[in-house]
From Swiss-Prot:
The keyword Nucleotide-binding applies. Monomer and homodimer. Part of the essential Sec protein translocation apparatus which comprises SecA, SecYEG and auxiliary proteins SecDF. Other proteins may also be involved. One of its GO terms (biological process) is protein targeting. It is a peripheral membrane protein. This is Protein translocase subunit SecA. The gene is secA. It comes from Clostridium botulinum (strain 657 / Type Ba4).
Amino acid sequence: MGILNKIFGTYSERELRRVNPIVNKIEALDEKMQSLKDEDFKLKTEEFKSRLEKGEKLDDILPEAFALVREAAHRTIGLKHYREQLIGGVVLHQGRIGEMKTGEGKTLVATLPAYVNALTGKGVHIVTVNDYLAKRDRDLMAPVYEFLGLKVGVILHNLNNEERQEAYGSDITYGTNSEFGFDYLRDNMVVYKEERVQRKLNFSIVDEVDSILIDEARTPLIISGQGEKSTEFYKVADYFTKSLIAEKDFTIDEKANSAMLTDEGVNKAENFFKVDNYADAENMEIQHHVVQALKANYVMKKDKDYMIKDGEILIVDEFTGRAMEGRRYSDGLHQAIEAKEGVRVERESKTLATITYQNYFRMYNKLSGMTGTAQTEENEFREIYGLDVIVIPTHEPIARIDNADVVYKSEKGKFKAIVDEIVERYKKGQPMLVGTVSIEKSEMLSSMLKKKGVPHQVLNAKYHEKEAEIISHAGEYGMVTIATNMAGRGTDIKLTKEAEEAGGLMIIGTERHESRRIDNQLRGRSGRQGDPGESRFFVSLEDDLMRIFGSERIQGIVDKLGLAEDEAIESKMVSSAIESAQKKVEGNNFDIRKTLLQYDDVINKQREIIYKQRSEVLEGEDLKDQIRDMIRDVVYTAVNSHISGVEEEFETELQNLVNYLEDICLPKALVKVKDISNLSDEEIKEKLLEAVENIYSNKEKEIGEEQIREIERVILLRVVDTKWMDHIDDMDHLKQGIGLRAYRQQDPVQAYQFEGSEMFEEMIYNIKVDTVRYLFHVEVEKAPEREKVAKETSTNYDEDSVKKQPIKKENRIGRNDLCPCGSGKKYKNCCGRMA
């Protein structure tokens, strides 16, 4: 591979050779654009739109359009895209990922493809990781777009529906991945089409694309309502788990991040919970609570995985070190942690709507992305999203010096060496950014530096409100900044002249992350736009990566050398062993994400069908034919399922059939068994269908054409939403237990696909049955009103939260409340009779 690259160039180099002629055309138009008057820019936009309407393609107008944006940026914000940024713009327009190093002006690059694709009138979404960056980027670039005659909006978490509609109606919309995803889910829960906020998903430019499409890929967006289970069991399981002895009663698997009972632990569980067989299926709930309590107490670490703030458990994002308010672990783990820490245990939630980022972003007609680090995950981008990665050359050569890793025997020796290094460089005024993997480690390092009298600033989940401000000062003379992982990503670290003379920004990594990409991101904070800088990672054999995934070979080398605690080893062999450990973990994580996607694809196809049907109900003026089809399906299926063809049982089967249909759509005693006992199966179907259709026709006349059509819509929406929410729950339960199928020589994914498909077909039939049942029992005294099955009671999340979960509460109808179908009767005397 290396020899071929030397002869033909890398994939990126070959692709860039194709892009260069386009960039030459853009640069050649520079003089022409400079000669335009300010008022000509809006006219050019109208001209481009007109040319597109007449059949020209975006690629035909691209050179001129890019050149126009370039000049507009120069006149409005004083920035002119340089050649490398033009290359980046072309790559994004082509629906690819552009790897652009920190400080290369990604925000400015996005204006080029955003403008060109907005000319179609279908909208462009520019996606970033938090509200601060979305608003900042929109405010910075709005003058450029507005000068060109385009409207630009931003989606922030505190906007109301009208403001969201206006922002999405803009030509270009900035916002966070979670806001875009949640708005899609909410749009598919509305009861009037006018309440929707998003248009069809057209073109998306994802900033920090690796963070959103890979780090976040395993995290589903969930809109949830309050569950009904008691929380007492979590406290009981926690009490039991705290009485166990490590290794004797339970074991911990650090690679799998899990804990499980030993045989001795199982005996203790059976005695404690007073059950004969802990593994019995009827004790599944006990098993579930014990497993989560074990994980909460012995795997999840305070100030690393979560933190406590004002009596609330907040998840800490492992990639950014941010606390994610409003987001909760699913499947009872959050409740188990609450029980462990002695804070109030909240009830488990019920999922009302959910989607993963993988499936949300794959719905766009065209997807592109920017990041400083994508190449290490190129295979995943290509395989899952169909995106290739093109490395964009830097404007200035990178002057940063990346030193080899230094490896210590113990963590204590490593941190002592880090502090010595910081003290040494602080004396000469060199600014330093020190990356840690957890709040706990950053606070430990902070206290060590305080003892040495080194002034510094700490940036972790506890102080993220000041994130951008803290990080922007990190390049000043003598400034020492300790930050958890990728905190402050998206904010440039600019060097002062004195800091530059002191050697530029020094990056110190206190531990290797399990992903090379995260390490590269930390390194990339230094050496922006040709600035001087340096980086070095300090590693110990006690670090998680080395301990869990590192090879025994490294341990062997260190043992042979007989290193003391504070002695270091620096060798290429050690560095390559570390890299192979990282590759092993990355491959493992990719496989996990691929498998999860296979599961999610099952429910994703089902989601698309349900949301499409829902949309047709909202859009359609008349559901008459659809309802008639449902009535026929219910009657025909009832006949097929009740009549077996066994003569001796025919009379009994007919009676059961009549009873069944009387519960759904036939008035009592309208059809008697003797009326149909001499008919064939097909004649029975026709006779029953005729009777049922006549009843419905009379109901239409009685209620009135206009009113019955709205009632059909109200009832169908309500039934679809209720059944879909229950189905999500059922699919979740199926997935939780499906892994055990491997013991039966069954492929769990295939079993999930097959059984999930059967459950979906059953749900579709039940939607028909319930819709018909409600329609035949409805009596109207006032005009019906549509009502959401789930009402949003609060959206408790922080603007920087990457994985937000609005807490939505299911709207329960009291038995004495008015029935939502619009009959004017109490629920218990109307639709509640069938509930």
